[in-house]
Amino acid sequence: MAFYSYNSVLAIARTRFPSHFVHPTCSSYSPSCAFLHLPDSHLNKTCMKNYESKKYSDPSQPGNTVLHPGTRLIQKLHTSTCWLQEVPGKPQLEQATKHPQVTSPQATKETGMEIKEGKQSYRQKIMDELKYYYNGFYLLWIDAKVAARMVWRLLHGQVLTRRERRRLLRTCVDFFRLVPFMVFLIVPFMEFLLPVFLKLFPEMLPSTFESESKKEEKQKKKMAVKLELAKFLQETMTEMARRNRAKMGDASTQLSSYVKQVQTGHKPSTKEIVRFSKLFEDQLALEHLDRPQLVALCKLLELQTFGTNNLLRFQLLMKLKSIKADDEIIAKEGVTALSVSELQAACRARGMRSLGLTEEQLRQQLTEWQDLHLKENVPPSLLLLSRTFYLIDVKPKPIEIPLSGEAPKTDILVELPTFTESKENMVDLAPQLKGTKDEDFIQPPPVTSSPITPSTPISLPKGPITSSEEPTLQAKSQMTAQNSKASSKGA
């Protein structure tokens, strides 16, 4: 009793005082063992540790009830949570339900990392911009070296191909674009305004700095503008045909019908264009065109639209001369020698469709242009206006749905079957069997191809059947039906 009371006093002292180790004064026996106590609300066990063997023993178990008098009582651990161990008398599933595991914050950390990766830091943005400008200048340096070789060949009397000539002109234009940037290098502290200048004027950079996605976006925007211009130019041609009906006669009506066919999707041929071009040789010259038509042609050829009418005509004449020279070079080398990108650029420079077509269609367009321009000698202004017929919107039009909830009226005529109102269809044949004998039912009548007609004619009342006569007629018909069934059963 004294020993257990001593242990209880020590336990109270441990909980009351902040000291973790309590050493007894009496040590008459060998201090080779230590008494370990875990004051836990869930797991309250007292263990005994042997320093020599380093083994733990539980005095609560049988066989360990005798304690060595030289033991030391030490508080080694104080916990406030439940030990995830098997407790005798309780299954493991109950412990799991009582103390659920807390979810680790790894999922939230991963989502946070994904969000951070989506939002680039300032350092990453700066590195991307530096790589972008480095690649642009590197490509420009390569073009400069190739252009130097081409110039050396020209100085030695060699002839360049169309592809090489276009590349040489492009590199020269790119170097001239770098001239305005020299001002930012000469003026002190003006280089800090370079980002603002590039943001406001992105086209001032050379062509090597332009990405493919930006090129596609520009081409799509220009294509949408050309479709609108094509509609405007088609309307101008129809108006000209209406004004000159007296001179042209039947040709004006043919032209108007032909324009409608083209607008619905008909593809114009070279013969038809040549036939109708003779009607506009004088009127569609650049000298006779108004300002709206000149502006539309300049936009079609991707030229500047500011200036007087004479300036616009001069721009168009110079552009048409360069196109004719390019056509002669293409005719010498052949259309088949051009790549897809070169075909698209050539069609775009001539005001034709360049997007949404296959390679064969692009080649066919270019060959038709050359036939009309070089062989048929069609005027250039009329040739440009004829190209507007090829700028047809390929996208299908949406189906127009009426705003009201009424269904659209259809013109389909439903033919209902017509029945011939004959006496045979209207007469009940049951009264005919009333006076026949049973023997007549046994012998079947001979089969003939002619239709069966009743032996005795039956006449219907001429007047309408009244309500008083209806029950008598129904009773007669029922009686005749019963007699016929009885006679058939007797047979």
Swiss-Prot record:
The Letm1 RBD domain, residue ranges: 221-438
Transit peptide start-stop: 1-25
Compartment(s): Mitochondrion inner membrane
Topological category with respect to the lipid bilayer: Single-pass membrane protein
Chain positions covered by the region annotation Disordered: 94-115, 435-491
UniProt superkingdom: Eukaryota
Ranges in the topological domain labelled Mitochondrial matrix: 199-491
Name of the protein in its database record: LETM1 domain-containing protein LETM2, mitochondrial
Organism: Homo sapiens
Organism classification: Eukaryota, Metazoa, Chordata, Craniata, Vertebrata
